[in-house]
From Swiss-Prot:
Protein name listed in UniProt: Ribonuclease P protein component
InterPro entries in alphabetical order: Ribosomal_Su5_D2-typ_SF (IPR020568), Ribsml_uS5_D2-typ_fold_subgr (IPR014721), RNase_P (IPR000100), RNase_P_CS (IPR020539)
Assembly information from the UniProt record: Consists of a catalytic RNA component (M1 or rnpB) and a protein subunit.
GO cellular component: ribonuclease P complex
Iron is among the record's keywords: no
Lineage summary: Bacteria, Pseudomonadati, Pseudomonadota, Alphaproteobacteria, Rickettsiales
EC number, as in UniProt: 3.1.26.5
Species this chain originates from: Rickettsia peacockii (strain Rustic)
Signal peptide bounds: none
Function: RNaseP catalyzes the removal of the 5'-leader sequence from pre-tRNA to produce the mature 5'-terminus. It can also cleave other RNA substrates such as 4.5S RNA. The protein component plays an auxiliary but essential role in vivo by binding to the 5'-leader sequence and broadening the substrate specificity of the ribozyme.
GO MF term set: 3'-tRNA processing endoribonuclease activity; ribonuclease P activity; tRNA binding
Protein family: Belongs to the RnpA family.
Pfam families: Ribonuclease_P
UniProt entry keywords in alphabetical sequence: Endonuclease, Hydrolase, Nuclease, RNA-binding, tRNA processing
Source domain of life: Bacteria
């Protein structure tokens, strides 16, 4: 399973427009399964965008740690065999408290939301 990141503002706006917005306690997830031609022609199956606001933390070190955790969570979730044939894109926006919650709980919450909306 190959994952790539959303590269520019146009891609983020496209997913925001086409995707379904899901508000959870620790994050907001925008997920789009019906992708435009730009994404369908790509060799990648999963497109990931991460938005970490300065409101979450003023320190870049903390924001980067949050991004690393999200990337790792997505790698774990997408490595599941049920995602092999599906092309989808998502944007994850962490909320306050995301950095304090333990990894296994985040994994459970995120996988539950993604699987429910595929």
């Amino acid at each position: 399973m190959s994952i790539t990141s959303l590269k520019n503002q146009k891609e983020f706006e496209l997913i925001n427009k086409l995707g379904k917005k899901l508000h959870e306690r620790y994050f907001i997830l925008v997920i789009a399964t019906k992708l435009p031609k730009i994404f369908l022609e790509s060799k990648y199956n999963t497109f990931l965008g991460i938005k970490v606001s300065r409101k979450l933390s003023k320190k870049a070190v903390v924001r980067n740690k949050i991004k690393r955790r999200i990337r790792h969570l997505i790698r774990i979730i997408v490595s599941d065999s049920s995602f092999k044939a599906i092309k989808f894109a998502m944007i994850i926006i962490p909320r306050k408290g995301f950095e304090e919650i333990n990894f296994s709980h985040l994994n459970y919450e995120l996988s539950k939301v993604i699987l429910r909306n595929m």
